């Protein structure tokens, strides 16, 4: 009975919080059924949540069908946590336009469009700026590119630092304006108000008084969109390289008796 009580307390007081792309799924692809099944097994021992830069619809598409995601996870934080769901219910939603104001927002959009107009790439497609509630997502190639084009751009970006140079130009142009920039995924980067990185979700979790919040992410180096929450003292950060690595790390921590099976 004592073991059962201890296990019940851990489920209530421990949260595993996961990034989405590269951590639970390949970039912008659906979750593997085996990974999804493992997460539900994990949920029997701890509470689980996701925090992603994408909007809610994209996260829901990757992690389930329709609104399954808010039933399968105790917490869903879309757009770095500016859109928050807890136990299937929408808690709050913030908007970047209300925070920044229209003048700064248009200056930012116009600068990005002008910069990208001068870029010469092997391919350009569509949706270069995606306007989300809590951020702008900027993609030099365009988010409508195919998977093959996404990989091609990613390889070029590693060599020529396309996104890195773009971000440096933005930092210079908008110095002192309260903006932050982070690289995420293979083809884009995010622009958001200072303090609106993935740590934003931790403020709402503070009131739930978890003993431990484990965070798992793949972009945990400086400049990556998981870095701030990974390094935050309120979390125990785990850097992973793939969904399979995420599962293995969780097995080692929460199912040590079966860790050798993976």
UniProtKB/Swiss-Prot annotation:
One of its GO terms (biological process) is mannose metabolic process. GO terms for cellular component: cytosol; neuronal cell body. Keywords: Acetylation, Cytoplasm, Isomerase, Magnesium, Metal-binding, Phosphoprotein. Mg(2+) 2 binds at residues 230, 232, 235. IMP, a metabolite whose concentration is elevated in anoxia, inhibits phosphomannomutase and phosphoglucomutase activities and strongly enhances glucose-1,6-bisphosphatase activity. Its EC number is 5.4.2.8. Alpha-D-mannose 1-phosphate binds at residues 28, 132, 143, 150, 186, 188, 190. Its cofactor is Mg(2+). Its main location: cytoplasm. The keyword Amino-acid biosynthesis does not apply. One of its GO terms (molecular function) is metal ion binding. It is found in: Cytoplasm. The modification Phosphoserine is found at residue 242. Pathway: Nucleotide-sugar biosynthesis; GDP-alpha-D-mannose biosynthesis; alpha-D-mannose 1-phosphate from D-fructose 6-phosphate: step 2/2. The keyword Oxidoreductase does not apply. Homodimer. This is Phosphomannomutase 1.
């Amino acid at each position: 009975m004592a073991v059962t009580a201890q296990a019940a307390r851990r489920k209530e007081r421990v949260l595993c919080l996961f990034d989405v792309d590269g951590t639970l799924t390949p970039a912008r692809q659906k979750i593997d059924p085996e990974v999804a099944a493992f997460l539900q097994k994990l949920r029997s021992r701890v509470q689980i949540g996701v925090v992603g830069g994408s909007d809610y619809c994209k996260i829901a598409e990757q992690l389930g069908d329709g609104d399954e995601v808010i039933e399968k996870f105790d917490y869903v934080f879309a757009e770095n946590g500016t859109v928050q769901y807890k136990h299937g219910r929408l808690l709050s939603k913030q908007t970047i336009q209300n925070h920044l104001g229209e003048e700064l927002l248009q200056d930012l959009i116009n600068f990005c469009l002008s910069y990208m107009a001068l870029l010469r790439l092997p391919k350009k497609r569509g949706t270069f700026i995606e306007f989300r509630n809590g951020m702008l997502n900027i993609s030099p190639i365009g988010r409508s590119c195919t998977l093959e084009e996404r990989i091609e751009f990613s390889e070029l970006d590693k060599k020529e630092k396309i996104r890195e140079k773009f971000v440096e130009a933005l930092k210079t142009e908008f110095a002192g304006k309260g903006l932050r920039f982070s690289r995420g995924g293979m083809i884009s980067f995010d622009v958001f108000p200072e303090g609106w990185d993935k740590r934003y979700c931790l403020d709402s979790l503070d009131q739930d008084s978890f003993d431990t919040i484990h965070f798992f992410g793949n972009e945990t180096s400086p400049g990556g969109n998981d870095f701030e929450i990974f390094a935050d003292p309120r979390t125990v950060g785990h850097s992973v390289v793939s969904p399979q690595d995420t599962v293995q790390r969780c097995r080692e921590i929460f199912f040590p008796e079966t860790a050798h099976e993976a």
